Amino acid sequence: MEEKSLLQKLRSYPPAVFFMLGNEFCERFSFYGMKTILFIYLITEHEFSPSKATFIYHLFTCIAYLTPLIGSIMADSVFGRFKVILYGSSIYVVGHVLLSLGAVPFLSYPIRSSLDFSGLFVIAFATGCIKPCVSAFAADQFTEDQKDLRSQFFSFFYFAINGGSLFAIIITPILRGRVQCFGNAHCFPLAFGVPGVLMLLALILFLMGWSMYKKHPPSKENVGSKVVAVIYTSLRKMVGGASRDKPVTHWLDHAAPEHSQKMIDSTRGLLNVAVIFCPLIFFWALFDQQGSTWVLQARRLDGRVGHFSILPEQIHAINPVCVLILVPIFEGWVYPALRKITRVTPLRKMAVGGLLTAFSFAIAGVLQLKVNETMEFPPSLGRIYLQRVGNESLISDFRYKSDGRLIGDGMLPKGRTELDAGIYTFNTGLKNESQEIDISTPNKGYVMAVFRLKDAVEVVKFDYKVEKTDNGATRVFVVTAREDADTLVYAINKKGKILSSCELKSGSYVDVIPGIISDPNVRLYWGPKNSCSGVDCPNTVTLNAQMGAVHVLHIHPSTTEGDFNLLVRPNSVSILWSLPQYIIITLGEVLLSVTGLEFAYSQAAPNMKSVLTAMWLLTVFAGNLIDMMISGTRLIPHPALEFFFYSTLMVIVMGVFILLAMQYTYVEDNDDEITITESEKKDVIALTEIESGTATSDKKE
C-alpha cells in the first residue's frame, strides 16, 4: 500500500485534536510564563529573602505536583476527563487574573499579597487537576485502528509542549525586565497578564471543539486504592501475628484471600520498581532549582553577550532546546555506538544520569565561588560604609563625636571606609572650624563629598544600598554642591535616545537598563532644561554601563567637569559560564528521568500504569519538598557550599542506587509485561512534562 503523505494523514485526524494542540501550547505558555518570572517577582516585589522566595517557589511546585492525584481521582471516579479539563481551565484563568491584579503596584501591600498568594494556589491547584487529563483526553479522540495516527499526533503534541514552554521562557522575562510600566523598572502586571491571556485562549480553543469531542464517562475504578488496600491488609495481618501462624514467601502474600493473587503479584512488582524511583526524588530536588537558586546565581552574572543581553530567567531556555537536540542524538548515535562496546541497560543509564546531575551542581558551586569574588556584602552589624569622593579638600582630625576617639590617623582617605554607625566630626583644612556628619543609621552605605567653594566648604552626603542593582541596570548617583532642580542629567545611548534622566541633586540617580540589543557605552549629559534637552547639553562624560555596577558622578562646582567613583562592583563573570551546568544537568535528565519512567513501565504489571504515573508525580513533589527544607530554610547559609552539599548528596544517593541496581533482576519479556507503545510513552511523559517539556524520540529501547 502506498504511504500516505503528511497532509493526507493530517486530514485523517479527528478534527477535535487540533483544538487540543492549540490548547496545550497556550496552557504550557501560561504556566511556564508565570513560573519563569515567579522567583524574581517574590524577591523584587515582595522583597522576600532568597531563602523565603525559594521556599514559596518550591511550595508552589509541590502543590502543582500533588494535586494531579486529586485530578485523576475526579476524572476517573466523578466527572470524567472532559469536565475536569473544563472546570480546571476555568479556575486556571481566575488564578491568572488574581496574580495579574496582585502585581499592580498601586494597590496596598496586604491586598496585593492576598491576591498574589490566592492566585498562586489557584493556579497550582488548577494545573495539577488538568495535568493527568489533557494528553489522555486527546488520545481518547482516536479509535483503536488509528494507533499510528495517535503516535504521530503525540509528536505534534510534544511540539506544542516544547514550543509553549520555550517561547514562554524567552518572552515573559522580556515583558518583565525590558518593558517599564506604572513608573517601575519591571512590568510584572504585563508579564503575568500575557500568560493569563494565553490561558484564556487555551480555554476558548478547548470550548471550540466541544461538539466534536468523544467524552467517555468516568471508569469508577481506582487501582491506587486497591494497592493501598493490599499493603494495609498485609501489614494488619503481620502485626496480628499471621506471619507466625502461616509462613509465606513474601509479606504481601498475607493479603490473600481478601485480594486476588494477580493483584498481590502486581503490587509486589510495583514495590520492586518503587526503589528505582528513589533517586528520582533527589534528581528533582536538584533539577527544579533551575527556577530558584540557579536564577539567583544568574542575577549576579554578566548577561551581556556582545551587544545582546540575556536575562537571568532566560538562560533556563537552554534546557528544552538541549533536550530536543540531545534525545535524538543519544537514541540515534550514542546508544547504538555504546552497545558495540558494552551492555547498555536502563539502570546503567540512570546511574550515569544521576552522577552527571551531581556534577552539574559541583560546577554550579565552583561558578558561585567565582561570583562571590564580585559580590558586594553589607557592612558588619552596627557598622556602615563611608565612601568619600572628590579631591577638593583633605579631611583631618576625623573623630567619633560621642567619645572623641580619633579614627586611624585622623585622615579620611578617598574611597570606602568601614566605620561604626554614629556622628563624626572633622576639619577640612580650609578653615579652622569643625564640620559634622551624621551617619548613624547602621548597615548602610554613605557617600560623602567635600566641596571647596569661594569662601566656604560644602559637605554633601547621602545614603545608598550596598547591593548590586537589579534588572541588569547600571546606576549612577549624582553628587554636587550646585543643586539645581532646573538642571537635568541625561543618560543617552549612541543612537541619541534618552534612557533615563534625573535632577542635578546629590543622591538623585539615573539607571541605564540594557535592552535586548544595546551598546554598553553611553554618555551622560547635563545642563539647564530650558536651554538643552539631551545631546545638546554642554557638559558630558562617557560611561561604560556594566551590569550590576553602581557609580557616583562627582560634578566639580567650578569646572562643571565630572568623574566617576565606583560604589558597587559590576557583574564581571559572564552568564555563558553557566552553560556547562545547564547542558550537563540536561544530559542527566535525558539519561535518568526519561529512562527511569520507561524502565518502570517495562517492569511493572499492566494494571499498574495509573499508579506508576501517580508515583512519578509524587517524586517531583518529594524533590521540591527537600528543596523547601534545605534551601527554603537556609540550612546552609553559603550558596556555594549549598551547591556542593546537593552534589555530594546526589553522589551518595546514586552510590546506594548502584549497589541496589547490581542486585536487581530484570523482568523478562512475557505476556504479562507492559507493552509500551510510543503513544503511551509520550502520553505519560507529556503528562509529567519532565518539567521542561521533554520529548523522547520515536525509537524504543
Curated annotation (Swiss-Prot):
What start and end residues bound the annotated signal peptide? none
Protein's membrane topology: Multi-pass membrane protein
Give the GO molecular function terms: dipeptide transmembrane transporter activity; proton channel activity
Superkingdom in the source lineage: Eukaryota
**Record's InterPro entries?**
MFS_trans_sf, Oligopep_transport, POT_fam, PTR2_symporter_CS
* A Pfam family: PTR2
Cited CDD domains: MFS_SLC15A1_2_like (cd17347)
Gene3D superfamilies attached to this UniProt entry: MFS general substrate transporter like domains
List glycan-bearing residues: 391, 432
Q: Which UniProt keywords apply?
A: Glycoprotein, Membrane, Peptide transport, Protein transport, Transmembrane, Transmembrane helix, Transport
Report the GO terms under cellular component. Answer: apical plasma membrane; plasma membrane
Q: List the disulfide bonds.
A: none
Q: What processes in GO biological process is this protein linked to?
A: dipeptide import across plasma membrane; dipeptide transport; protein transport; proton transmembrane transport
Q: In which tissues is it expressed?
A: Expressed in the AVA interneuron.
- Function as written in the Swiss-Prot or TrEMBL entry: Neuron-specific, H(+)-coupled oligopeptide transporter with broad specificity towards di- and tripeptides in a Na(+) and Cl(-)-independent manner. Shows H(+) channel activity in the absence of peptide substrates.
Cite the PANTHER family for this sequence: OLIGOPEPTIDE TRANSPORTER-RELATED
In Swiss-Prot or TrEMBL terms, this protein is called Peptide transporter 3
What is the organism field in this record?
A: Caenorhabditis elegans
* Gene this chain is encoded by: pept-3
